[in-house]
Amino acid sequence: MLNEVLKGIEGLDNDMILKAKNRVDSLAKPLGSLGKLEDIAIRLSGITGNMFNNIDKKCVIIMSSDNGVEEEGVASAPQCVTLLQTKNFIKGTTGVATLAKSNGTDLMVFDVGINSDEVVEGVINRKISKGTKNIYKEPAMTYEEAKKSLEIGIEAVKIAKEKGYKILGVGEMGIGNTTTSAAVLKALIGCETSQVVGKGGGINNASFEKKKRIVEEVVKKHNINFDDPIDIISKVGGYDIGAMTGVFLGAAFYRIPVVIDGFISVVAALLANRLNPLVKEFCFTSHKSQEIGYELAIKELGLDPMLDLNMRLGEGSGCPIAFSVIDFATAMMNNMATFEEGNIDNSYLEDVKDEECYIVL
């Protein structure tokens, strides 16, 4: 499945992008005056191949898994919180769940590696094992397990497509996963440890220093093939990160627009884009995460955050917010009149199309 997807991803529909841009420029407004909404609408058309789109059926896919490195004391919460919060996703009481309910967004929650035998009703069970190994002592998983995590993410998109979802978000739950994400990002781009390690959910200074030391050491000790994103996941990543990477790959393959949440989500998007550089064309950002490594990762991906709300929750919480903005972009494209439809003579625009200036109607 994985190789088929990697080879089967095609780029945006450039003919439709040109048509969509011409449509946007013909709308009864000063050129470019709706800013990023115009860019969003145009790229959405390039993804779907349709001039007019709607995202009335929305879903955040959440990958839950435990990380063995938690036993090193790098997280503020105990490991049992992964299972508890996964249950709360289903109850609708977490941050992402309450935001999602406000604009009709559904959640699709997967157990890819929670350290528990408990079966949670409403959670899709794709458990690879009960948590990864402690990356401070040994590789997180085997190479085959890493590939399996990616394929679970791809399968999740296939399920979402069959259910009729028109836009996806990518979230997670896994105590310790800011540590694994920081290690993955450091391995991917070769940066300083201090540039990628933050305090995650909130840890004291001693734990923070330990977290930085662990990330520094694990990237050196496991004989990582830095040119192979799957090997990076297997050595220092997590099942959650791998499955999220698969969601981004699947979204590009099935041509469904997909929204990046925060730090862990953007690291997964970057991994997917390293596996196939067309992936980022299908990605929309949401918010600028306050977790320190986010800025490096989004810059490496070549995208800009849509919003800056001082958020750092994770879970996919930024995705429903971005869905609303994307909804506004589709409303503009679908419902706004052109100059011709509004009986407005737009000949005055000919003098300014190639100049950097603004016109107030």
UniProtKB/Swiss-Prot annotation:
Reactions the enzyme catalyzes: 5,6-dimethylbenzimidazole + nicotinate beta-D-ribonucleotide = alpha-ribazole 5'-phosphate + nicotinate + H(+)
* One term of GO molecular function: nicotinate-nucleotide-dimethylbenzimidazole phosphoribosyltransferase activity
Active site annotation, chain numbering: E315
- Asked if Acyltransferase is a keyword of the record, the answer is no
What InterPro entries does its record include? Nict_dMeBzImd_PRibTrfase, Nict_dMeBzImd_PRibTrfase_bact, Nict_dMeBzImd_PRibTrfase_N, Nict_dMeBzImd_PRibTrfase_sf
Name the pathway: Nucleoside biosynthesis; alpha-ribazole biosynthesis; alpha-ribazole from 5,6-dimethylbenzimidazole: step 1/2
Query: So what EC number does this one have?
Result: 2.4.2.21
Pfam families tied to this protein: DBI_PRT (PF02277)
Q: Which UniProt keywords apply?
A: Cobalamin biosynthesis, Glycosyltransferase, Transferase
Q: Which GO terms describe its biological process?
A: cobalamin biosynthetic process
Q: Which CDD domains match?
A: DMB-PRT_CobT (cd02439)
Its biological purpose is as follows: Catalyzes the synthesis of alpha-ribazole-5'-phosphate from nicotinate mononucleotide (NAMN) and 5,6-dimethylbenzimidazole (DMB).
Give the protein family.
Belongs to the CobT family.
Q: What is this protein called?
A: Nicotinate-nucleotide--dimethylbenzimidazole phosphoribosyltransferase
